Amino acid sequence: MAKGKFERTKPHVNVGTIGHVDHGKTTLTAAITTVLASKFGGEAKGYDQIDAAPEEKARGITINTAHVEYETANRHYAHVDCPGHADYVKNMITGAAQMDGAILVCSAADGPMPQTREHILLARQVGVPYIIVFLNKCDMVDDAELLELVEMEVRELLDKYDFPGDKTPIIHGSAKLAMEGDKGPLGEQAIMKLADALDTYIPLPERAVDGAFLMPVEDVFSISGRGTVVTGRVERGVIKVGEEIEIVGIADTQKTTCTGVEMFRKLLDQGQAGDNVGILLRGTKREDVQRGQVLCKPGSIKPHTHFTGEIYVLSKDEGGRHTPFFNNYRPQFYFRTTDVTGAIELPEGKEMVMPGDNVSITVKLINPIAMEEGLRFAIREGGKTVGAGVVAKIIA
């Protein structure tokens, strides 16, 4: 049962902690909730409450994720923290927890480590737009020059993956001290600095309803005397009666006009993001539209067949493949509402991909799909999910 009423007075932003194992992601998450709860209200969470992350399923993949919330003076944040590295990989690739920005936690005592690099790369591949750095465990480093060196390394690493290293806020602190109630510059003050960086460096995300209209086609009906009705859930934007729309994907792009919007058998003058609607199309035949296409604002999205992506391949225990796959593997790619066959090209020097791996791939589909960078997909074999992925870059 929900505890207390959710006050939607402050704008809402989704964030999460990323970084190498044992650099203090979960301790920092606990410290943020504790310090901000004392300043702005909300619930303080202890390390153990966050570490015991519940299992959840996203696209058939089991992921352990802890969700906490906290408030700053200006905003309400939903924050995700994952216990294990594999959970991060799955979470970011499936988009189970979309992040408007990430807090990269890096230990000042160790400097950047392999997963620090991998999480920055993943953030770039899956389209996390902003990263803020929390240099943790600064209480364990007495040498100011060493701190400067670690900070330089982190900035170089961010630059390498196309994040603005020089402009990125880097906060020095100690999550452990903050948890212990230390009011000094590395304790509570560092957490308040981090909160300020979240408020100022991460812009408010565009609300789904403000985007360009897009609705994946789920079903198509023909209603005698009225024409063709397409049903689906509006993903973003607003559709008004009388507006021109395009049908994109699989076949050649067609133009049509929305002559009616229905919801729960009632006629509306518009449908918006989140609504399950039926859209009546003027002059469009039933056979001109099929599941897997999208209705969209003209010119807002194009069909593509060739792209690079980042994928996670399910392990045998997760119900995935039992054997590796090789170059030119041809599974089905499930985009929004339909499967399209495609061929996978592995990166140079990569012989094969084992179940449980994540890898960057290049894909050529046999039919075009309405696609943008950041679009999620599942990889299937005979209707069974064997992987999950995200479009990193469109080639053609």
Swiss-Prot record:
It comes from the Bacteria. HAMAP family: EF_Tu_B. PROSITE patterns: G_TR_1, G_TR_2. Signal peptide: none annotated. Monomer. GTP hydrolase that promotes the GTP-dependent binding of aminoacyl-tRNA to the A-site of ribosomes during protein biosynthesis. This is Elongation factor Tu. It catalyses: GTP + H2O = GDP + phosphate + H(+). Residues 60-64 are annotated as: G2. Its EC number is 3.6.5.3. GO terms for cellular component: cytosol. Residues 10-206 form the tr-type G domain. It is found in: Cytoplasm. Mg(2+) binds at residue 26. It comes from Polaromonas sp. (strain JS666 / ATCC BAA-500). Residues 19-26 are annotated as: G1. Residues 81-84 are annotated as: G3. It is an enzyme of class 3 (hydrolase). GTP binds at residues 19-26, 81-85, 136-139. Belongs to the TRAFAC class translation factor GTPase superfamily. Classic translation factor GTPase family. EF-Tu/EF-1A subfamily.
